């Protein structure tokens, strides 16, 4: 799947037009609580002539279940947001300083679900690189890129089954990359993207 690292932007757009179920996703919560909406930006950036994805590492906070985790920039939908694309762009600007006008939205993946009762819309885009990022330190400790060529190598990740509330759920773990460990919902979104990009339109 190394050809994914050099796909043209038009081919990425074409492949995003297809409908493909989320990969290794957890089912939506079936309790009575209304599901909360969130969106993340999945940014393709060009590094040394090949695509990489831009990730963040969350800042450490006591009693925060997402503290220190690797993620895509993003967050909760707000009523002032026109749509979920706007949510992803606003949150990315707030968290790492990327201007919305510098982002080219290509499409989106199907919804993913988190164990914290969120329905997440992954918005796929490109942006210039390198970029002068400004981190909101209360939320973001670091940013880094991982080459798509590395992410598509099946020797770099594994899927395990975990029992939560009596249900067997898949948990995806990538091998550490420069000390960063990609797992959980962000890892599932990454695999969904790879699966979608790997099928011809």
Name each region found by the language model.
Residues 1-71, 76-94, 98-131, 149, ...:
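N-terminal leader/linker segments that precede catalytic domains of diphosphate-processing enzymes
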Residues 137, 155, 194:
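Short, flexible helix/strand-to-coil boundary loops that buttress conserved ligand/catalytic motifs
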Residues 133-150:
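Acidic, glycine-rich loop-and-strand cores that form catalytic or ligand-binding grooves
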Residues 155, 159-163:
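Acidic, negatively charged sequence signal
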């Amino acid at each position: 799947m190394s050809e994914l690292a050099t796909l043209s932007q038009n081919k990425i757009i074409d492949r995003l037009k297809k409908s493909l179920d989320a990969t290794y996703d957890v089912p939506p919560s079936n309790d009575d609580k209304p599901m909360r909406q969130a969106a993340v930006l999945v940014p393709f950036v060009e590094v040394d002539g090949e695509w990489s994805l831009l990730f963040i590492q969350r800042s450490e906070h006591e009693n925060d279940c997402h503290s220190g985790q690797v993620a895509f920039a993003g967050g909760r939908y707000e009523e002032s947001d026109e749509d979920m694309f706007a949510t992803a762009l606003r949150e990315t600007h707030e968290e790492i300083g990327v201007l919305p006008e510098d982002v080219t939205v290509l499409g989106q993946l199907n919804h993913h679900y988190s164990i914290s009762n969120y329905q997440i819309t992954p918005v796929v885009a490109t942006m210039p690189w390198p970029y002068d990022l400004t981190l909101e330190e209360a939320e973001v400790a670091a940013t880094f890129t991982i080459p798509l060529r590395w992410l598509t190598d099946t020797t770099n990740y594994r899927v395990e089954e975990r029992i939560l509330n009596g249900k067997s759920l898949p948990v995806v773990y990538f091998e550490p990359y420069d000390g960063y460990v990609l797992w959980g919902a962000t890892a599932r979104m990454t695999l969904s993207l790879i699966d979608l990009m790997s099928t011809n339109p």
